[in-house]
Curated annotation (Swiss-Prot):
Family per similarity comment: Belongs to the intron maturase 2 family. MatK subfamily.
Subcellular location: Plastid, Chloroplast
Residues in coiled coil: none
Cellular component, GO, one term: chloroplast
GO molecular function: RNA binding
Function: Usually encoded in the trnK tRNA gene intron. Probably assists in splicing its own and other chloroplast group II introns.
Biological processes annotated in GO: mRNA processing; RNA splicing; tRNA processing
Organism this protein belongs to: Pinus yunnanensis
Record-given protein name: Maturase K
Major subcellular site: plastid
Amino acid sequence: MDEFHRCGKEDSFWQPCFLYPLFFQEDLYAISHDHYLDVSSSSRPMEHLSSNDQLSFLTVKRLIGQIRQQNHSIVLFVNCDPNPLADRKKSFYSESVLEALTLVLEVPFSIWSKSSVEGMNECKSFRSIHSIFPFLEDKFPHSNSILDARIPYSIHPEILVRTFRRWIRDAPSLHPLRSVLYDYRNSPENLQRSIIVVPRVNTRFFLFLLNYYVWECESILFSRLKRSSHSRSLAHGSFPQRTHFHRKIKHIIIFSRRNSLKSIWSLKDPKIHYVRYGERPIIAIKGADLLVKKCRYYLLIFRQFYFHLWSEPYRVCSHQLSKNCSSSPGYFLRVRMNPLLVRTKTLDELFIPVLITNEMDPIVPIVPIIGLLATEKFCDISGRPISKLSWTSLTDDDILDRFDQIWRNLFHYYSGSFDRDGLYRIKYILLLSCAKTLACKHKSTIRVVRKELGPELFKKSFSKEREFDSLPFSSKAAARSQRERIWHSDIPQINPLANSWQKIQDLKIENLFDQ
């Protein structure tokens, strides 16, 4: 596979033209066979296969022909079907073929994605959740509108195959993909409907489809954004001191008019910025309302004509940051005016100018979080803690660890907010819910539990806060907590409660448009 990748770099024309012969390479199925065994053994216990159940290359070749038959859809997608009728042996061979198909399609996709990232160096593309928060800090205060453009989750199988056809000239290599996608629908009456391109099972094939679909959407959008902005992004900021002027001069370009001795100085400042987390791209725009309407109209038309997909209007929402809040990602986001007093002393007199700067103000959604905790049976709808009855069968250490993990995730994720006082209300709810759960398990009272455990109750989270407050750069963290914030760098992913709250917000928007 590495050799094929090197050949694809040396000859870009050969790479997309001869993919179909790879389906008949025994090494390819050996790789997919080993990968399937590793995934199966890690996810669930698997019986030892006898010598007659080992991978047979002739059987795989026969199965390639059987994929095109309609009556083998249950065999291929046994893990997706709620009523599987195929045996394990057939599922084993079908999963091997799916792994082989994914390996073949991943080779050109890896080359395309790498070349596209190399071509977007001026766009400063970062692929990490930690790049979301610097984006919010840097771009949101200097934008007056945002577009919340959710990626369409459904697309017709033939449209997806044709997007592959634009990049792969080898048409026979796409026949297995077309057969797999059409068999995935499992019923002839759904021929006119669209399929969901979200992985219903944790297989490599469906994850690849999702990644390719998102990459296809973003590659077109990036090319359009680069046309609208021919220079890289500049970090905004006020420069009240002369020592900071060199930062500004570095981002100034000079060009001359024809037949003119005058030079024009232009500050490189694009007006459109893009970020994405999950399936929710966010486009920050600095401009008039007409520019925002044009961008929203372009996104709707782009999805309609490029993917032949009608996108509901509520899936592309525009917000004015100065008037109302936006929800992203798990925060209420707004932009507030922050007056900055600058004293400039000269020889003659003293000037005291006042600079008005914008600052992003992320707000912790306390009421929605309490509602989610009530849904998970940690408290009632009014925020009164209750016992988690489903956890009473666990050990005391497991109960303490689970409550501690929930609080640590919430505290770390929402530490970037200025006002974190509402988080301690959440901590109070979790603390009493944990005590009530332990009291219900041991058939005692909360007073007895708190007397027996003492500092052991939420000990880890308390020590984590003390460790954070005792850092050298935050010796006065208690006094500065209301005016400074630090984003924790150990956030591995979007908080699950933030995802749940975001889904509730999406349902509210959909119901509003349905009315």
